[in-house]
């Protein structure tokens, strides 16, 4: 169960199939219908049931924290306060609102009476953030991404398409880290994937970091030495929601469109419960 990493991991599995000669074209991505999530319960020996919302992600109960608690622990570990988290959330919403027209080409329009854009982003203010209810410590409803429904897919091909600025999936890294601080996992994944392809952060032109929590993005920027001005330039999950299985693929779709437009080298990275992390590099040929 790759949880939040699954959308990016699907791309790497598709790339592996093509590299092994098992396929010429692969459609890879993810779908999440959080609004239709099943009712989950453990059946006890006496026949009774105990409901639960978060599944177990490690065999050690004392190393399997609630994700909000893990985010708050990450904030303490990284020295990131609530004001910094709120500021990142405010910027995410502002960038998403400013980019609605820019992102229109990324969204497949489904005529079922719903908005043809990400409808959640809004003018978020410091005052609203201050009033937001705390979930755990410095982690609040304002600096945490809401659960969402979405789907995102990429088409991977063995041969480069005969188009201007074809985008190449260089490759990626999936790693395991401390399950108590899963937000640190993308840092190691970023460092390893850059090392594998003999690149450094100065070579990156576009960066998409999953922001299930504001502190997650801030910790990745801080830990991996990323330029914050390059990260989530059109807003992120804080402004649009976190459709778990689709979130990683959404990062890749964003990079694809930006790289097709301007060229360069793009990085996408995401963390998942259990201490998982995946980082992927794309570039224009």
Identify the function of each model-found stretch:
Residues 196, 218-223, 227-232, 237-281:
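Internal helix-turn-beta structural module
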Residues 108, 170-239:
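Active-site pocket-lining segment
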Residues 84-166, 223, 228-230:
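N-terminal extracellular/periplasmic Venus flytrap/periplasmic-binding protein-like
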Residues 19, 25-73:
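Flexible glycine-/small-residue-enriched beta->alpha junction loops
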Residues 1-6, 61-63, 143-148, 208-210, ...:
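Active-site nucleophile and cofactor-binding loops and adjacent substrate-binding regions
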């Amino acid at each position: 169960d790759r949880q939040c990493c699954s959308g990016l991991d699907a791309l790497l599995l598709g790339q592996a199939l093509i590299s092994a000669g098992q396929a010429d074209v692969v459609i890879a991505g993810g779908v999440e219908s959080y609004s239709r999530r099943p009712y989950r319960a453990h059946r006890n020996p006496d026949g009774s049931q105990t409901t639960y919302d978060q599944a177990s992600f490690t065999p050690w109960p004392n190393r399997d924290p609630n994700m909000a608690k893990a985010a708050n622990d990450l904030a303490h570990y990284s020295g990131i306060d609530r004001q910094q988290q709120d500021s990142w959330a405010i910027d995410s919403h502002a960038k998403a609102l400013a980019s609605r027209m820019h992102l229109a080409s990324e969204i497949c329009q489904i005529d079922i009476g719903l908005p043809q854009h990400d409808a959640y982003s809004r003018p978020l203010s410091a005052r609203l953030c201050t009033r937001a209810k705390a979930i755990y410590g410095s982690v609040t409803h304002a600096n945490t991404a809401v659960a969402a429904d979405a789907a995102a897919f990429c088409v991977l091909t063995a041969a480069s398409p005969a188009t201007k600025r074809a985008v190449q999936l260089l490759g990626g890294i999936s790693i395991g880290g401390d399950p108590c601080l899963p937000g640190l996992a993308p840092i190691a994944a970023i460092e390893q994937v850059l090392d594998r392809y003999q690149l450094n952060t100065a070579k990156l032109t576009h960066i998409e970091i999953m922001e299930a929590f504001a502190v997650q993005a801030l910790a990745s920027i801080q830990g991996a030495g990323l330029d914050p001005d390059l990260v989530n330039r059109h807003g992120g999950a804080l402004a649009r929601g976190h459709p778990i299985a689709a979130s990683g693929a959404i990062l890749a779709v964003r990079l694809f469109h930006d790289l097709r437009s301007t060229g360069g080298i793009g990085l996408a990275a995401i963390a998942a419960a259990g201490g998982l992390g995946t980082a992927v590099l794309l570039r224009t040929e």
